[in-house]
């Protein structure tokens, strides 16, 4: 049995000024002819502030599949490496058989049987198997793919026994920004575990009487799925989600495509998509991840303003750039600048050559 690993090409470049967003700074409330993005008045609840972002233009993303959609339809299959038998679509010329009698830590494989390319976002949590795991980077999986390495980090230290042979991300959590940042930027399992521990402790501190089962679990997903934790998250996420969904409907013709996130008045994150439709598909997961960051963070509440949010979005001048590419499929660009890192996922598929998602984190 042969296994086709889609191997990206990685290019490093040290540059003085790099930007997939152009370098001028738009005034808050004005659409820049260069950046094409405008930050709107914020939605606030507690210590969480979300700034809607609208675009001058958007793209048709109907040809792309999300992980939730693929799992729901059964077109996408996720399994441990040891369960590959029978999943390979075709043999490669001269390819030998590759077998494994046991699962390998952090090695999941995915098959996309759909006729649409699959979007994977860093931070999506896949539960089941030997451990719960988080996807480590944004990427595209081609339509009707052979098994590919999913590229994950464990978010459940201490367990390496099967809870279920079935993997699921449908309706599951998106890791909060602090955990996403460790997976995307540090790319280090120990640092991911460390941040999971901090996030888990911060969340449990908000639960008045944590159950013994909750206190005993090392699973990030199970903590987030706890009833009392859910109530805490709902108290922040539901009002913000409701207000933003209403705003999206009102601003659909103005191309609402993303958000900038502040916690305790400090800008921490931005998620920008190629279309309103794509944003709406991820919004329920995203807003709860932002709420988890806010609920688990203790600091004196301040307020970020539109000008600060617009400046954060516009500043894409970088000292260093890393480009990872699977020719003809996608390109991921990582930009390191003063006080931030940004990650741009660009489709290279015919007729859909545009940025699908941009994630930007404050450092």
Model-derived features: positions:
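Bacterial N-terminal signal peptides that target proteins for export
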Residues: 1-10
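Intrinsically disordered, low-complexity segments enriched in small/polar residues
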Residues: 19-118, 123-363
């Amino acid at each position: 049995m042969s296994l086709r690993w889609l191997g990206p090409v990685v290019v490093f470049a040290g540059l003085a000024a790099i930007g997939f967003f152009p370098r001028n700074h738009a005034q808050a409330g004005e659409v820049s002819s260069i950046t094409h993005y405008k930050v709107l008045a914020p939605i606030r609840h507690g210590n969480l502030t979300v700034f809607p972002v609208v675009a001058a233009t958007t793209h048709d993303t109907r040809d792309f599949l999300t992980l939730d959609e693929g799992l729901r339809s059964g077109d996408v299959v996720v399994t441990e490496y040891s369960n590959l038998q029978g999943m390979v679509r075709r043999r490669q010329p001269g390819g030998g058989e590759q077998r494994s009698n046991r699962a390998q830590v952090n090695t999941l494989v995915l098959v996309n049987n759909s006729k649409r390319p699959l979007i994977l976002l860093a931070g999506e949590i896949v539960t089941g198997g030997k451990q719960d795991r988080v996807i480590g980077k944004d990427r595209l999986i081609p339509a009707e793919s052979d098994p590919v390495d999913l590229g994950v980090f464990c978010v459940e230290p201490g367990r390496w026994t099967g809870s279920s042979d079935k993997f699921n991300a449908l309706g599951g959590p998106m890791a909060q920004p602090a955990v996403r940042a460790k997976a995307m930027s540090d790319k280090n399992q120990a640092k991911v575990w460390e941040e999971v521990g901090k996030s888990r402790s911060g969340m449990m501190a908000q639960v008045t009487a944590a159950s013994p089962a909750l206190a005993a679990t090392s699973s990030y997903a199970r903590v987030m799925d706890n009833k009392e934790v859910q109530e805490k998250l709902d108290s922040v996420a539901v009002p913000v989600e409701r207000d933003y969904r209403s705003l999206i409907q009102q601003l659909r013709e103005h191309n609402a495509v993303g958000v900038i996130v502040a916690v305790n008045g400090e800008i921490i994150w931005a998620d920008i998509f190629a279309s309103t439709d794509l944003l709406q598909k991820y919004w329920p997961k995203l807003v709860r991840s932002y709420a988890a960051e806010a609920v688990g963070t203790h600091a004196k509440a301040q307020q970020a303003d539109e000008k600060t949010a617009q400046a954060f979005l516009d500043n894409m001048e970088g000292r260093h750039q890393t480009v990872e590419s699977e020719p003809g499929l996608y390109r991921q660009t990582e930009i390191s600048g003063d006080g931030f890192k940004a990650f741009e996922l660009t489709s290279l598929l015919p007729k859909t050559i545009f940025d699908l998602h941009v994630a930007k984190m404050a450092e």
